Amino acid sequence: MATLRDIKRKIDAVKKTSQITKAMNMVAAAKLRGAQQNMERFHPYAEKFNEVIERLAEGVEDAGQYVLLTPREEVKKIELVLVTADRGLCGSFNNNLIVMAERFLKAKQAEGCQVRLTAVGRKGGDYFRRRTFEVRKRMTGLLNKPSYEDAAVLGRELIEQFEIGECDEVYVIYSRFLSMVRQQATLMKLLPIAPAKKTEAEEKGRLEYLFEPSHEALLTDLLPNYVFIEILESLYQTAVGEHAARMAAMENATSNCKELVKTLTLTYNKARQAGITKELMDIVGGAEALKK
């Protein structure tokens, strides 16, 4: 049975752990506010850019002249970009993304496709480095402060790989931020580009645009930027999801520490009371023996 000193040592250790998790919760909350503001500012721009690309693509007579818009007749090579966090302590956040990626890669392999992985984030890269899948590239630090420059570097490389035939399709798995307590692992097809189509109700209310210069000239310039923007959007969403998941995990950990301290304190008091009772009984027993 644990001694009073052992129990007291455990209580002190749990209290120190609680202080650490509380501090990490506060740091995650501060980072979350900044990341969420950036995501919310960028999202309307990304949506409008997608709409422009859709309009331009509709006005082009021969979309086949654009490599980024043209599906391959036979898909044999798949590139997957997996976006995870660089650090842990965020619950099942990274695991959900990794599980989806592994299932996707295995499914494509079963179809006879050659699969390659670009790991954005240390956790995903570390996991697949120990597996049989080919990790073509690893990138870290992008979620600390997502930037257009970083997204463009990755996007240009993926576009080049697609144009020279090193991959027939490019997919991205990232965490879509739904709420403070819910983040959803999401699979997005990046290349070839297939702009989102408007619903019939949305089509009725939209205005017609006049484009200058021509649709073709604009598409040539804007299609690569569409890829960059989609990548940046996935980075923003995943960064916000990471901080929200870590804040929730640290809040739960702090709550668990408090409950454990209560339990240990109760155990400590019971053990101390039992010790005092035993000492009193020994004293009374000794006094009775002296009387005899």
From Swiss-Prot:
InterPro entries: ATP_synth_F1_ATPase_gsu (IPR035968), ATP_synth_F1_gsu (IPR000131), ATP_synth_F1_gsu_CS (IPR023632). The keyword Hydrolase does not apply. GO terms for cellular component: plasma membrane; proton-transporting ATP synthase complex. GO terms for molecular function: ATP binding; proton-transporting ATP synthase activity, rotational mechanism. The keyword Transport applies. It is found in: Cell inner membrane. Keywords: ATP synthesis, Cell inner membrane, Cell membrane, CF(1), Hydrogen ion transport, Ion transport, Membrane, Transport. It is a peripheral membrane protein. It comes from the Bacteria. F-type ATPases have 2 components, CF(1) - the catalytic core - and CF(0) - the membrane proton channel. CF(1) has five subunits: alpha(3), beta(3), gamma(1), delta(1), epsilon(1). CF(0) has three main subunits: a, b and c. Belongs to the ATPase gamma chain family. This is ATP synthase gamma chain. It comes from Syntrophobacter fumaroxidans (strain DSM 10017 / MPOB). The gene is atpG.
